[in-house]
Amino acid sequence: MKEQLNSIRVQAEQELSNVGTIAELENIRVKYLGKKGELTAVLRGMGSLSPEERPVIGQLANEIRAYIESRIEEARNELIKKERSQKLEREVIDVTMPGKRKMLGKKHPLSIVIDEIKDVFIGMGYEIAEGPEVELDYYNFEALNIPRNHPARDVQDTFYINNNILLRTQTSPVQIRVMENKKPPIKIICPGRVYRSDAVDATHSPIFHQVEGLVVDKGVTMGDLVGTLRVFAKSLFGEKTEIRLRPHHFPFTEPSAEVDVSCWACGGTGCRICKNEGWIEILGAGMVHPKVLEVCGIDPEVYSGFAFGLGVERTAMGRFNIDDMRLLYENDIRFLKQF
């Protein structure tokens, strides 16, 4: 039996010296140390030994088991180290290769235009004012010299929540709130979302953005308004941009005007974008109506002011030559990543 045990040790050593994988190593372990392994089979025959031989053979068997277990563990560690090295060689990193570029977010074209408008007017000393989008009828209409029978109050144009509360149709209510709570001089712009019951098409949306401006002080004139709008147009659309004013009517300003800029695409010679007119309407403006000043507790005999308002979507469409407003809201990455 001693010869059998020594033979098992020699045979196991030979096989362990040539093992190449973890799977082969496991097969060797089972072959010699498993429940039906060769070493286990020899130990089962110890019952036939004499009492004197059993301790000697038992000690030898335990030494051989311990030796085989130790060699298996050594071989396992070597194989793991070898496999790790081979994996690193296969997956070598070329540090000279360019890295994977991450997708970075960009500003939405509407945000770009709003920020540009803010920068222009902040540079002229204006402050930013904001107000609620869910507004009282008084601030949205009455305080702006729009009586209850005025067409602008038609339910077809306005989203009413109840008879006294609505979604603001313009950012003008912010101007009223500022004039109520601040004494002149006042110099503000009011950017924000507004709501009107319009069908969605290439140039209309029930939700859109406006930026309105207000200046109230002693001695403010129409000339100040024209100069301000000229600086704004040149800053936003380029130094060669010209403006023109056409008489118009707004309930909250008097006199009032629609303001056009020379076409940014053709420079005023006429093209498809400006419908061959050379001019594109961008905003409405005028001198603040005396009744509006009075409602806010400002004496129109002492103070005067001007106001203006423009649609951000249409300005962005002109700024970036976009021909359909709906593109601004469809969240198509192929479109938005151009800006």
From Swiss-Prot:
An example Gene Ontology biological process: phenylalanyl-tRNA aminoacylation
InterPro entries associated with the record: aa-tRNA-synth_II, aa-tRNA-synth_II/BPL/LPL, Phe-tRNA-synth_IIc_asu, Phe-tRNA_ligase_II_N, Phe_tRNA_ligase_alpha1_bac, Phenylalanyl-tRNA_Synthase, tRNA-bd_arm
Chemical reaction(s) catalysed: tRNA(Phe) + L-phenylalanine + ATP = L-phenylalanyl-tRNA(Phe) + AMP + diphosphate + H(+)
Primary localisation category: cytoplasm
Disulfide bonds: none
Cofactor comment text: Binds 2 magnesium ions per tetramer.
UniProt key word Cytoplasm: yes
Binding site for Mg(2+): E254
Location(s) in or outside the cell: Cytoplasm
GO cellular component terms attached to this protein's record: cytoplasm
CDD domains hit by this protein: PheRS_alpha_core
Family: Belongs to the class-II aminoacyl-tRNA synthetase family. Phe-tRNA synthetase alpha subunit type 1 subfamily.
Protein name: Phenylalanine--tRNA ligase alpha subunit
